[in-house]
Amino acid sequence: MNQVRLAADSSCDLLTLSGMDFVSVPLTIRTETEEFRDDAALDVDGMVRALRDTNGRSYSACPNVADWEGAFGGCGDVIAFTITSGLSGSYGVACAAKESCEERDPSRRIQVFDSLSAGPEIALLIEKAAAELRAGTNFDTVCNVLKSYQSQTHLLFALESMHNLAQNGRVSKLAATVAGVLGIRVVGQASAEGTLEMLGKCRGARRTLECLLRAMERLGYRGGRVRIGHCQNEVLAQDFCSELLHLFPQADIKSYPLRGLCSYYAERGGIMLGFEA
């Protein structure tokens, strides 16, 4: 297996990767009075509760150059992944760290991917990179494979609450309040430009699953891998897994709790799903 390090900011929801040299670089969620570092020590449920009670501004902060340089280490090749540059400065900072590391050691090769996404879609990209490296694929070919593969993956999400999005100015507070009062779930996707794109609104778990399935079909899903991350909503995530497996019995589908950064955006009850088209 090629000895290439994989690194990603914590929007990937992974802390370790079995059998691989993998480093997670924490983002931070901040309010006017508290700070939550998205690392292994974070109490995600506690953070979600605290943010629900926050009426002031909240926002996410990306890793700094030193954080990324530490993740890249002092030698060797690295493939790194960041949350979409449409939501965070993590990609730009990682690129600055790459340039600094390569200036110190011109023999190094560091490839940074702007995922144009978050969470489960990044997990798919990392899994693909790991599979290629385990198979002995060389560095340049792995990077080319990932560039092609990225065009075949997508991210959808369904949100029960938009409180945090309103608190950091990404949606209007009126829209967030109305959706909450009416019990409306918002379904959306990561656009081709890496921004949040709303696709529709629905009420109830059944309608939410139907809306997500229709969106997957429109984007070309035919039974490929699916990764479902949830924020305190294991029931909906498992129901969606069951629905997909009923339609596509051979599909590779996994669900798991989101970590800090993605829980900040998905909020309580929200789910995010990455899939192959």
Model-predicted regions and their roles:
Residues 2-3, 11-29, 33-34, 87-90, ...:
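Mixed-charge interfacial surface used for oligomerization/domain docking
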Residues 7:
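Generic enzyme active-site microenvironment
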Residues 34-104:
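Class I S-adenosyl-L-methionine
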Residues 82, 111-112:
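A glycine-rich beta-strand to alpha-helix segment
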Residues 105-111:
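Ligand-binding "clamshell"
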